[in-house]
């Protein structure tokens, strides 16, 4: 009887995860995973998985490196394997850190702001995952140690938004091809501006984007990325914030080889 009940429970879990989010690696130690349904934690509109890798030789973690995907099914799906990235694992191991990769189960045509604005529930889900993963892994310090945030596109928007909400928790942030708004944009009324707290000026931030995202190529799908990055940079630098920008010379919105700049400087 117990076997039958367990079978149907497993089937229910599998059926609840729709393609392309239903195929992912098993999380066996040193990997750990938690998953929340939509609205299970706060107001988050979509289900989400948080997978973390913890170096086995580390007794007490010093921080968490968060690798945050962007918008759309293809990018969100990449978060399912992000914790297995050997380059980022090497960086995490070097600093006695964990490596986390969230995966928001956003339908392709859904509004990305429903998760990439952390005020829409992803902040609450992220912080709850640290508590739950701390219990699961035997590393309760996950709930309190600082974060280094890397995000691409909508993930950059999310990481930058977290800097505004939790500057006291963040060591550094790398925003690839995406930043939050600090002023209202009448062309994007669906995106709410963040307040810029004084403490956020102390967080080192790198804005990194491809040259074809409006820097050298002023037309095309991603031409608005550079103006948004420039406005974000100028607002923070005008108040002596710790911010810089870098232009990848060969790319558009794809990540390209930016990791070879990001990882050594994180």
Whereabouts are the PLM-identified features?
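A domain-start/cap signature at the N-terminus of enzymes
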Residues: 16-64, 94-95, 145-168
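Short substrate-entry loop that stabilizes the transition state in hydrolases
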Residues: 58-109, 182-183, 215-217
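Loop/turn elements at helix/coil->beta-strand transitions in domains of secreted/extracellular proteins
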Residues: 60-64, 94-100, 143-147, 167-172, ...
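Serine-hydrolase-like catalytic core of hydrolytic proteins
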Residues: 70-72, 95, 123-124, 148-150, ...
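Alpha/beta-hydrolase active-site loop
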Residues: 114-140
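The feature captures the conserved acid-bearing segment of alpha/beta-hydrolase catalytic domains
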Residues: 171-260
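Catalytic active-site module of serine/aspartate enzymes centered on a nucleophile-bearing elbow/loop
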Residues: 262-266
